[in-house]
Amino acid sequence: MGFRIGKNLLFNLRKAPGSRVKARKTMVSVTMATSEWIQFFKEAGIPPGPAVNYAVMFVDNRIQKSMLLDLNKEIMNELGVTVVGDIIAILKHAKVVHRQDMCKAATESVPCNPSPLQGELRRGASSAASRMIANSLNHDSPPHTPTRRSDNSTSKISVTVSNKMAAKSAKAAALAHREEESLVVPTKRRRVTAEMEGKYIIHMPKGTTPRTRKILEQQQAAKGLHRTSVFDRLGAESKADTTTGTKPTGVFSRLGATPEMDEDLAWDSDNDSSSSSVLQYAGVLKKLGRGPTKASAQPALTVKAKAASSATSTATTPKLRRLALPSRPGLQKKPDSLPKVSILQRLGKAAVVSEAQDSQVTSTKSKSSAEVKFAIKRTLVGPRGSSSSESLGAQMDHAGTVSVFKRLGQRTF
């Protein structure tokens, strides 16, 4: 391609001899541009043969150094660069060259002017002291050297050195940028572990404000703490005494008896309970289905009747004794077989009495002149115990004439 361009230029010079100067200038610029592009591709790492071809293509398509950042894969394919590795290397080197050109333009645009202080001192150097200060400043400051513009030849020679310097400057700029970012970022506080800090002190709300009271109520509802005592649920300050008193709960104590009577009753009840053969009231008209009772030391009921005649008193006493109450059902076992007992054996030997007195018993309310008086001696068996004399007196008062068989009950076989 380069030889064709040269032949075309020579052919044009022969045809137009008046334009030789212009052709020479264009040829010099083309050759310089081609050499620059060849050096560019060599620095990018492309072999010499493809580098010359790429340089000629860039010159033919009038690619300038200021267009390096506009290059991309599609444009490189249109220019004839199809190797992927060459495309990547050219694009990377294009960025580096663009940075170098920008740095050169920045350094050339800022000239090194002398300090304005020295000019002012020189202008106002009227006295000896001012002249001495100005001379000392001139001796201390280095002489100002004018900047020289680098030629194309020197730039070609120092391309590799400038590339290295540009890489170093880019690294330095990156480090400076990182340092600035680190300065901007706020410093993180060092974490303090629980062992270094110590135990936490948590102050719970005391319920002085409505909000804290509400929070405490919610916590208690969440925990589900239920009061286990009735007194806690009722709000009592102290529990009442649930133990019963040691006072006696007898009938006389509940009726308001005197302490002396209570002591007597307690002593009688102790004596009665100590005896093993205490008889209980079983009722006159009930069936006698149990065995014979034991004779008691102290009978539960003693009845003395006084009548007008001595015969009546001797007759009523054994009958009432024979009708004494049976003993407790749990104190003795029932016999296996009960013998048949006749009525006369159960009644015992009867005294010589009148027939009227054997067959009937008169009440105190009757019209007869005989008066029957009962002297009752009770023993306190228990709260459930009932007096047999009361039932007997009631029966004798209200019932007119009661036979012995009715009072003895039915016969047991």
UniProtKB/Swiss-Prot annotation:
Biased composition annotated in UniProt, kind: Polar residues: 127-139
Biased composition (Low complexity): 302-318
Entry keywords, A to Z: Isopeptide bond, Phosphoprotein, Ubl conjugation
Coiled-coil region(s): none
Phosphoserine, modified sites: S115, S141, S269, S296, S342
InterPro entries: C19orf47-like, C19orf47_SAM, DUF5577, SAM/pointed_sf
Cross-link Glycyl lysine isopeptide (Lys-Gly) (interchain with G-Cter in SUMO2), sequence positions: K239
Region (Disordered): 108-158, 232-257, 290-336
Protein name in the entry: Uncharacterized protein C19orf47 homolog
